[in-house]
Regions:
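Catalytic beta/alpha-barrel core
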Residues: 43-48, 70-78, 93-103, 123
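Conserved anion-binding
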Residues: 101-140
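Active-site mouth loops of central-metabolism enzymes
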Residues: 3-29, 53, 96-100, 128-134
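Glycine-rich, proline-tolerant flexible connector loops at the mouths of alpha/beta enzymes
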Residues: 35-70
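Conserved, mostly hydrophobic/aromatic
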Residues: 34, 85
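Gly-rich Lys/Arg/Thr-decorated short loops/hinges at beta-loop-alpha junctions or inter-strand turns
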Residues: 9-16, 36-45, 120-128
């Protein structure tokens, strides 16, 4: 079993404020605390507007990597943000939140193949979360 620290997520209000204000100390403390608690990976999710996300995700990656030496899990549905962030990660990242939505697959799977990244896949597509196990299995 691998433990993924999930506290660096821009959908959390305080983290969103830290991203917007470029509060590196706050983000770095979250990273260090999770690493010290035994996380094998750190999830980084800018959780911001799509137009800001590439820049914000890059800032998060740089900020976190400057204080911990564990692999990162890049968590974004935005292929543009992932494309930029994957260029600066120091260790092969994991890609989080791949789903069966064609636009995500088309934008993200080439990155996964090129960089040989492990993935976390969500069993859902354009129709949302499947209602039956059979439909779920067709997605994965």
């Amino acid at each position: 079993m691998k433990i993924i620290g999930e506290k660096i997520n821009g959908t959390r209000q305080r983290v969103a404020q830290a991203i917007a204000g470029r509060d590196a100390d706050y983000i770095q403390k979250l990273a260090q605390d999770q690493a010290e608690a035994g996380a094998d990976w750190l999830d980084v999710n800018a959780g911001t507007k799509q137009s800001n996300e590439p820049e914000d995700l890059i800032w998060l990656v740089e900020t976190v990597q400057s204080v911990v030496d564990i692999p990162l899990c890049l968590d974004s549905p935005n292929p543009a943000a992932l494309t930029e962030a994957i260029q600066i990660v120091e260790r092969t990242p994991m890609i989080n939140s791949i789903s069966g939505e064609p636009w995500r697959l088309d934008g993200i799977l080439p990155l996964v193949a090129k960089h040989r990244c492990p993935v976390i896949a969500l069993a859902m597509d354009d129709g949302g979360i499947p209602e039956t196990m059979r439909t779920t299995l067709t997605l994965i």
